[in-house]
Amino acid sequence: MRVVVSGTHASGKSTLVSDLAAACPPAEVLPDPFELVDDAAAEPDASTFVEQLYVAAARLEEVSGPGRLVVAERGPLDLLAYLDALVELGRPTADPAAADDARETVARAMDGVDLVLVLDPDDVPEPEDEDPDLRAAMHEALLALLDDPDLVGGATVVDVAGPRRSRLEQALRAIGEADSRRPGNVGPPT
């Protein structure tokens, strides 16, 4: 089962992924693509988001196998939302051809995702040094993209909100429900 924890920056993704890994051993954790991009700028820009999008997509397409639980911190849809947010904010973004290619890549990668857990950024204090305008615009763009069945594929989308413990409980419940609908399921999370 492939689970993507999605949300804008500073929304609690790392915390939830860590909590899920502890609650569901031996879950395989895929870290934030930001950590895997060598030239990630201090202030991410369109080229950084595009590179992270391709990293996020490739790793989702590479993981497979029955009985495996894979939890990805941020998926390619998140990075596409950042590109859309840059447009909304009037900031430099990817050229139209690159954006179209990115959408196709997202659709292919998301086709294999079973569950998307979407975090509510309002549950985490907004850090002033984290570009609050981009944070808000990305969240709105992500919600719009999650309504596009061509991009989400067959993934179940579940909003996760509240304090840390409640988020973990909601995520575990969503994983259990999504897994029960899959043939050859991995069993309920512990």
Question: Model-found features: residue ranges?
Answer:
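Short loop/turn segments at strand-loop or loop-helix junctions that form parts
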Residues: 32-33, 73-76, 82-83, 117-123
